[in-house]
Amino acid sequence: MENNKLKLSIKTLQSIFSNTNEPEWFLNTRKLALYKSYTLPFPKLESMELERWNLFNVDFSTLRLENKGNVEIAEYGINSDDFAVVQKNNTIVHINIPEKYADKVVIKDIFSAMNDNHIKDSFMSVVDYAESKVTAVHYTLLNAGLFIDVKDNVVIEEPLQYIVISDKEQSIFNHVTIQVGKNAKFNFIENYVNNQREDKAPFSLVSEVVAHEGAQINYSSITNQPGEKRGTILRRGLTYRDSLINWNVAAMDEADVYHDNTTNILGDGSEANLKIVTLGVKEQKTYFNSEVVNQGLSSKGDILQHGVLLDRSHIVFNGVGFIVKGATGSNAYQSSRMLTLSSEAKADANPMLLIDENDVMAGHGASLGRIDEEQLYYLQSRGLTRKESSRLLVHGFLSPVISELTVDKIKELVTILIDEKINNNERE
């Protein structure tokens, strides 16, 4: 399909990104990725076709927008002395690192970081441009992002807040790379804010997390893209010996989104946990490919994902637990549950275990069901409306995942977004 090819010359590509101050090696990567994008396939999905999503209908003139006026960070719940990064459109407009952390962590916009050699240890190490058409286009048009390097033996309990604001119609190809040093501990919260209800520009978000020996990172994410948009979100992790990555994902979008959440549990004794909560509305299509790949001895990988469907939405949970040959003593578990509040909604769950080793523990479970009319009737008999009753049951259904989110601010925001979506979309 012609709409799935970037109509972009090398000359135009160079012109678009002439003001990023990026090194020549990355410009060459853009060119290679552009060539690859013409021949690489889309990821193969069950029940959905990315080829039909028109993901690459990009207005190239909006890839590098100028921000006008000051950004009032207080509007987004950020104080000037908070440990925080604020990005507006494609530009980081605020970075504050408290003095006590100044020599413990490096935080830079992605293009500034490219000019430091140590970024090459982690940037593009987990997500390769030649992986698929989606990744090739992402690296071709990468226009914003953040690089974080937490030094060895550093423990930072206070979470870094990363607020990404879009107040204009723009395609954002955002890239976050986080490298956590040996025996370090780090907490990260990202919140994508877009109140442009008529924004139709496609988006591509990629996060790479590398946890070195003994490191721990809690990565919490809220996305809330508007309903006219379509896009892809890739979150990838790599764990070395005795390290831990906790992914806490609240996908509150109204946009059609393909999510790929994959962690390679490489080191012996390392662990990855993925928790996802989502709510589908209107005609929304959402696909989650969630994978944990146990490669190290006595490694552990868990997937827990809960979804609620309203209206005519369609959600797919594709879960894969893969224990490779030689990963003895490993443990892989996954649970996918979906609750439908509409007879027109469609829910699919595809749990898979791929086990190439004997001395392991593995399990999976999936459940799809309609909201319980008897429970609704009971609550309504106590004076609640049907909508209020539905909201209580939805919160109860999602609470096992929301309660596992490690940051109170994330829990509160997710709860508010769930209530808004039920009030705006659920039929009486």
Label the predicted regions.
Residues T12, S367-E373, R391-L393:
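Short acidic alpha-helix initiation/capping motifs at coil-to-helix transition points
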Residues S37, S270, S389-S390:
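Small-residue helix-packing motif on alpha-helices
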Residues P41-E49, I156-E157, K300, K387:
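Short amphipathic alpha-helical segments with coiled-coil-like heptad repeat character
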Residues D103, M114-L384, L398-E428:
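Conserved beta-strand/loop scaffold segments within soluble protein domains that form the structured core
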